[in-house]
Amino acid sequence: MRTRLLTATTALALLFGAGGAYAGMDEAKAFLDKEIGDLSSLPRADQEKEMQWFIDAAKPFAGMEIKVVSETITTHEYESKVLAKAFSDITGIKITHDLIGEGDVVEKLQTQMQSGENVYDAYVNDSDLIGTHWRYQQARSLTDWMANEGKDVTNPGLDLADFIGTKFTTAPDGKLYQLPDQQFANLYWFRYDWFNDEKNKADFKAKYGYDLGVPVNWSAYEDIAEFFTGREIDGKKVYGHMDYGKKDPSLGWRFTDAWLSMAGNGDKGLPNGLPVDEWGIKVNEKSQPVGSCVARGGDTNGPASVYSIQKYLDWMKAYAPPEAQGMTFSESGPVPAQGNVAQQIFWYTAFTADMVKKGLPVMNDDGTPKWRMAPSPHGVYWKDGMKLGYQDVGSWTLLKSTPDDRAKAAWLYAQFVTSKTVDVKKSHVGLTLIRESSIQHESFTKRAPELGGLIEFYRSPARVQWSPTGTNVPDYPKLAQLWWQAIGDASSGAKTPQEAMDSLCAEQEKVMERLERAGIQGDIGPKLAEEQDLEYWNKDAVAKGNLAPQLKIENEKEKPQTINYDELVKSWNK
């Protein structure tokens, strides 16, 4: 998840819970009255029925002290401060829900995986690690768990089909390894008011020959960025783009979070490109990673990837505020809300709650935003059938090294905080939607005009093109850390985009080579291919009906295309 720095909350551990003697239906009813009310997809009688199931299932574990961990974002703060206490009061299981930094969560997880010691009883861990969990086989398959040891503590009302993110937490073996707890997409953000201003529209049409609107491709995004940069609006000069460029770990996910796929890197396929994904990592028919560099059939340093880095650098230099180059993710995040940026191509919906606060320069007096979010534009190498952006899915993960009874108690809590009883209310607090029943709830229909397009997007057929990192990545923690260093060299000017990506793919292959040599991931671990040239692998891909690695397109400035935002939303509702 990318928002660990959005809140200034320090790491916090809250121990809640009443003794088992006090747990029960009275506590459940008090919780439903005070906290849930009508904000549930279940009617009150069914809420009480679900609470009774939790009370009964928890009896063997009453009085146990269970520790779970997640990163620090609004959704998890709500779980830690409100839902953990409610669960403890209702079930008698004492829950400590720790909130720590995203990197620290991964560190604790790795410590437990490497040592076998039970550090936490459950983790909310990014589904970006699905390929890691499947290959190391240290996380419990939830499919097997729910059918066997965990059967007696699996909520009959869990309704997995209602979760919109289970495709992302399912491995190539068809088994579910993680249960989504919160998710958010990375979309295009723009000033709806400026785009609908008659003078802006007329001036843009006169200069570029087409209508100002939501850019469908990068070519139009570039024109719009150029048009607004230096333009005076409400007495101040504005910028056509916002980004960040400091060589810092947060620069890594600016790219691993599907920037390359937005450009057209990798193959077609949803939720992720196959056989080559958006990291440029190729797998064979046995899901073994065979390479990252174009020399082995990968695409990390292919023309589409290099183009994506070049555009990132060009736009930041020409159209973003000068300070953007030296900013980190958390420093750049609040800038669009200050009112001098026209659009941002890489914007997380997790920012929504902070962007709709009353009194901000980007808010109207009636409580509606002056901005909207829309699907991301795509680069010149992108083809229909490819993913179009990133979606973060923080998911409950149970490790095999956690004793069964502790895993059972933690699994009850994981199901409680994602249950139909509480999910609508939790979604209103954190705006990180995970259930179809919550997305369609009438309370979100009412609130939608205040959320800048979030609900319209999640109700649209377009959302399937936004997905997390997929199963091609064999060891997310080891590989992800290579990205910010390599791209930092391009951002600082120490290397060209081609040199930076050549170096990145080589470093990724070194990690894969070590994994292959160690044999630690068995017959689904890396098996590096023989080296050939780009033309060889492109011809091979095309012969098999695939794309990657694509050859360089000589003219990377394609015909610009835009769409009217309101027409786009109408088309979703047809």
For each predicted feature, which ranges?
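Hinge/lid segment of periplasmic solute-binding proteins
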Residues: M25-P60, S127-L187, K370-P375, L547-W572
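Short, polar/charged alpha-helical segment
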Residues: E50-A57, T74-K94, W189, D193, ...
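Long, aromatic- and glycine/proline-rich binding clefts that accommodate carbohydrate-like moieties
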Residues: M51-W53, E65, T368-H378, H428-S491, ...
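Extracytoplasmic "Venus flytrap"/periplasmic binding protein-like
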Residues: K85-D162, E198-K199, D203-K205, V335, ...
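Short helix-initiation/N-cap motifs at beta->coil->alpha
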Residues: I100-K108, V216-A220, E323-Q338
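Periplasmic solute-binding protein
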Residues: S127-A139, T143-A147, F163-Y210, E222, ...
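Extracytoplasmic/periplasmic substrate-recognition and gating elements
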Residues: T170, G174, K317-P322, E331, ...
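Glycine-centered hinge/linker elements that transmit conformational signals in sensory
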Residues: A220-E226, A263-G326, S376
